[in-house]
Amino acid sequence: MKYLTLLCALLLSSCYEVERNCNEFKTGTFESKITIDGVQYNSIFSRTSKLQVEEFNGVKDSTYVRWINDCEMIFKTIHPKNLAEQKDIHLKILTTTQNSYKFEYGYVGDTNKQLGSATRID
């Protein structure tokens, strides 16, 4: 009986697929929320298929956007001001809802990832 219950649980859980309708979020205006070391940071950004302009703490920053696939992209800062801004950022959309998505991001080649969410505001 234990094995039957375990088998049923495995079969049911393997059928669940996370919704990822990433194409709905390739362009638009969004509010992003990330938490780093227990502090939440909010920003507003607008994205076209090739460019993203973000405002954080009153400072605007522009990046080129290169889509790797439907749910992953690389950001390259247009006018980097320091070495950290010269590093490209990889972002992967993990899950989507009707008007928001959860994502992970980090420097290209770095195993350290941060999590965040973005909500469409346009």
Describe the role of every protein-language-model region.
Residues 16-18:
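Bacterial signal peptide processing site
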Residues 22-38:
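Tryptophan-anchored aromatic micro-motifs
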Residues 40-68:
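N-terminal glycine/threonine-rich, aromatic-flanked beta-hairpin/loop signature
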Residues 54, 102-115:
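Short, exposed beta-strand-loop hairpins at the edges of beta-sheets
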Residues 64-72, 93-100, 120-122:
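A short, structured loop/turn motif at beta-sheet edges
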